[in-house]
Design a protein with these regions (language model features):
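Extended, low-polarity segments enriched in aliphatic/aromatic residues
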Residues: 1-110
Length: 110
């Protein structure tokens, strides 16, 4: 479904209603999800929020891929894995190009 999910998001009744995107990245699964074995669970300690759904997806995606590479689950990003984000960018749903995303990090240490 991920290869075509951009089509659903581009549907006019949905497209104009998405104004804030929040992704819970406090605890995540980097392999075998959604009900992964404990060795594939990690604490990203992150909440992603933005008005651009594609940019939020891209930043979250990059976090998971980096963890997969760090843990030896894969050696590099798989070709075409971001196709759904590139398609969403073509539909002008948001920005998939990491170089064009304005990322603001806020550290909330207790």
């Amino acid at each position: 479904w991920h290869d075509t999910c951009a089509y659903a998001c581009a549907f006019p009744p949905l497209r104009d209603k998405v104004v804030l995107n929040i992704a819970d990245g406090l605890t995540g699964c980097f392999d075998g999800g959604p009900a992964a074995n404990p060795q594939f669970i990690c604490h990203y300690n992150t909440i992603l929020a933005g008005s651009d759904p594609v940019a939020v997806d891209r930043i979250g995606y990059d976090m998971v891929i980096a963890k997969r590479i760090e843990e030896g689950v894969q050696e590099e990003e798989k070709a075409g894995a971001r196709a759904f984000m590139d398609m969403a960018q073509e539909f002008k749903l948001g920005v998939a190009d990491k170089e064009k995303i304005e990322l603001v990090e806020i550290d909330l240490q207790a």
